[in-house]
Amino acid sequence: MARSSKMMVAARLLALALAVSTAEARNIKTTTTEKKDDAVVQPQTFPPFDRLGGGASPAFGGLPGGSIPGSSIPGFSMPGSGSSLPGFSLPGSGTMPLFGGGSPGFSGFGGMPGSPTAGSVPEHANKP
């Protein structure tokens, strides 16, 4: 009898150890699966630099789509940079003043405060 009771205790301990190890293995599997899910869903950087359609700083090695000089918008060019598409470029900086000043016919009117054209009108010249 003593022998069979020892066998029963050993069998129960073995079953308990097996149950604990199975539960441990299930926990390891679920944590591994959770880690895989976390690895699949990763936050993106903003803005996504690989989707931009224009020129970038040389630090990034340039981005695709920046074939028009001085512009990151396809078919549009900033003043003085030139454009391969006629009709989409702004006039060069020598033909139209961007920040006031007016044209030579209106030299005394318009302009930004403190600009050279502001001093050509006596009213502007007397202001502090």
Swiss-Prot record:
Sequence repeats: 64-67, 64-75, 69-72, 69-80, 74-77, 79-82, 81-92, 86-89, 91-94, 104-107, 113-116
Entry coiled-coil feature ranges: none
Region annotated 3 X approximate tandem repeats, chain positions: 64-92
Record's compositionally biased regions (Gly residues): 52-68, 99-113
Keyword Transmembrane applies: no
InterPro entries named among the record's database cross-references: MFS18
Start and end residues of each stretch annotated as 8 X 4 AA approximate repeats: 64-116
Biased composition (Low complexity): 69-79
Keywords annotated in UniProt: Repeat, Signal
UniProt keyword Repeat present: yes
Gene name, Swiss-Prot/TrEMBL: MFS18
UniProt-listed Pfam families: MFS18 (PF17352)
Endpoints of the signal sequence: 1-25
Protein name: MFS18 protein
Expression across tissues: Enhanced expression in male flowers. Accumulates in the glumes and in anther walls, paleas and lemmas of mature florets.
UniProt organism field: Zea mays
Region (Disordered): 26-79, 99-128
